[in-house]
């Protein structure tokens, strides 16, 4: 989980890099903090997308994740058939 303190540190390192440059240790810290931030962002986005349901005109609900998984399975099967 990314905290407000982590975001402040990311921004602090960014501004310092533009103003005067970073040490090797600060560059490594910046890289790790950014990687952690991107990972948390992606996990959060994935969680939101997986919980979305689409309502059809007939009133039925479709789970977006299940629909996506079915589509990916179909595409994989089609590619496997083309490969044979």
Curated annotation (Swiss-Prot):
GO terms for cellular component: cytoplasm. The keyword Transcription does not apply. InterPro entries: DUF896. It is found in: Cytoplasm. The keyword Magnesium does not apply. Disulfide bonds: none annotated. Signal peptide: none annotated. Keywords: Cytoplasm. Pfam families: DUF896. HAMAP family: UPF0291. PANTHER family: UPF0291 PROTEIN BC_1827, UPF0291 PROTEIN CBO2609/CLC_2481. Belongs to the UPF0291 family. This is UPF0291 protein EUBELI_00985. It comes from Lachnospira eligens (strain ATCC 27750 / DSM 3376 / VPI C15-48 / C15-B4).
